């Protein structure tokens, strides 16, 4: 009699009926195999605990991957938060001690608390001192030399962003400072000299454009020269007009009192134009010594011309005097091209016979 046994995989296994002894022997063998506890591992049937260990290892590996991603994300977030602090530290590398107001602004910009900002700067200064172990160095030199002295996986003070990029190893200067100094307009020649010396020292070609600008002193001097030239033309024109009026009056023979007063009051005889008219009174003139002394007061262009005019005026006044014993006359003395002197003198007149 045949017996059909269905295994777990759904396949049919056919056993032949060999008799009772064979059946008992087969049943013993099968039962012995099931009853023996040491036969399990040899066949390769896994027990419960090894399966749990494998599952735990798998979960542990996936968890490690997830945790690694979280750590990297957290590190990147911390670097992004610390970037404004690094930028401030590099810009103020001569004195890396922010004030309370600056700490508050940095805390708002970096999404940190005020305590975190203070701790970050304290740790940064401590790292600079411990890494660059030279006692007589300034903070700026420590910051520039930090990346050369740092070892291992320690954080470096490199600042990079979209707005400005600068490395604090001392080799490349910050680009924003170079642009600010290179395109600044100089105000004086000293600024231009300072920029040229900076070009020789730092090799910045952008600041050469600063020499093309015109300094304010030159501009002011040009305006002043233009103003002085206009004023000089005006004075020369006024002086020429005054000389023409004086010559016409000299040819007429004498000044009237009204004309002389108008000459004194007129604005054309101002100090700026250099025209002076004044009057002197002398009680007596008995000889030509007074005239000669008055003529020697200032240099004249044509002394002979004016002497002849004075002599003609004296003869005219003498000829007109009939009953008078004493009279007055006017004498014009030309001091220079733009200075005239009017002198009124008393002369004894000779009676006619």
Curated annotation (Swiss-Prot):
Q: Record's Gene Ontology CC terms? A: nucleus; transcription regulator complex
What CDD domains does the annotation carry? Answer: homeodomain
Q: Where is this region: Disordered?
A: 18-50, 157-183, 243-302
DNA-binding region (UniProt annotation): 71-132
Give compartment(s).
Nucleus
Q: Which UniProt keywords apply?
A: Developmental protein, DNA-binding, Homeobox, Nucleus
Biological process (GO), any one: tendon cell differentiation
- Sum up the protein's function in the record's words: May act as a morphogenetic regulator of cell adhesion. Participates in the early events that lead to differentiation.
| Stated name of the protein | Homeobox protein Mohawk
Lineage, highest ranks first: Eukaryota, Metazoa, Chordata, Craniata, Vertebrata
Gene giving rise to this polypeptide: Mkx
């Amino acid at each position: 009699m045949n017996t059909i046994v269905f295994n777990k995989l759904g396949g049919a296994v056919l056993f032949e009926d060999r008799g009772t002894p064979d059946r008992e022997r087969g049943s013993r063998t099968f039962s012995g195999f099931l009853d023996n506890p040491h036969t399990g591992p040899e066949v390769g049937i896994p027990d419960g605990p090894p399966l749990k260990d494998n599952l735990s290892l798998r979960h542990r590996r996936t968890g490690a991957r997830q945790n690694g991603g979280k750590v990297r994300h957290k590190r990147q977030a911390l670097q992004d938060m610390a970037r404004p602090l690094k930028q401030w530290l590099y810009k103020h590398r001569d004195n890396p001690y922010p004030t309370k107001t600056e700490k508050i602004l940095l805390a708002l910009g970096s999404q940190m608390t005020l305590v975190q900002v203070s701790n970050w700067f304290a740790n940064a200064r401590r790292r600079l001192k411990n890494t660059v172990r030279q006692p007589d160095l300034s903070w700026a030199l420590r910051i520039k030399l930090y990346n050369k002295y740092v070892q291992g996986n320690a954080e470096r003070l490199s600042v990079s962003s979209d707005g400005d990029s600068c490395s604090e190893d001392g080799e490349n200067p910050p680009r924003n400072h170079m642009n600010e100094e290179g395109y600044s307009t100089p105000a004086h020649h000293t600024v231009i000299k300072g920029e040229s010396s900076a070009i020789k020292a730092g090799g910045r070609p952008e600041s050469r454009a600063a020499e093309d600008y015109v300094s304010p002193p030159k501009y002011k001097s040009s305006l002043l020269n233009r103003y002085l030239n206009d004023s000089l033309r005006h004075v020369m024109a006024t002086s020429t007009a005054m000389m023409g009026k004086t010559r016409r009056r000299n040819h007429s023979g004498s000044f009237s009192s009204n004309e002389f007063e108008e000459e004194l009051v007129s604005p054309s005889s101002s100090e700026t134009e250099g025209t002076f008219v004044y009057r002197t009174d002398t009680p007596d003139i008995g000889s030509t010594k007074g005239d000669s002394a008055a003529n020697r007061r200032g240099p004249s262009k044509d002394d002979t011309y004016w002497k002849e005019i004075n002599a003609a005026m004296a003869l005219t006044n003498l000829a007109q005097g009939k009953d008078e014993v004493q009279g007055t006359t006017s004498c014009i003395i030309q001091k220079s091209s733009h200075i005239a002197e009017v002198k009124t003198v008393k002369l004894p007149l000779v009676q006619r016979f």
